[in-house]
Amino acid sequence: MIYVDLPADLNLEDDQGRNIARLSDAVSPEAVTPGAVLVAGALRAWSWVVVEALDSGFVYFRQVSAHEAARRGSLVSPLPRSA
């Protein structure tokens, strides 16, 4: 089962083509740091993502393949606190 770390509308992009989400929506905001690999989106439409920047309460990230996400670290993590 997939747990979404960062609820987001994956159709919402900035002028640089990065996706945007609110940091306050993250399951564990302290885990959302530049370079972090997360699952973003919704249960019906999600993606592996890499966080690029945090600014004024917003998270800027790009979607990546599972292969690229796995190169950055384990894709298996403990259950989130909200599970």
Tell where the protein language model's regions lie, with residue ranges.
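Short beta-strand-centered aromatic/proline hotspots
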Residues: 45-56
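Acidic surface patches and DE-rich sequence motifs
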Residues: 14, 42, 54
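Short, well-ordered loop/turn sites that connect or cap secondary structure elements
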Residues: 30-33
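Short, solvent-exposed loop/turn positions at domain surfaces
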Residues: 25-27
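Short, basic/aromatic beta-hairpin or loop at an interaction surface
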Residues: 1-21
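Glycine- and charge-enriched low-complexity intrinsically disordered segments
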Residues: 55-83
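Short, charged beta-turn/beta-strand-edge "cap" motif at the junction between a beta-strand
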Residues: 37, 41-47
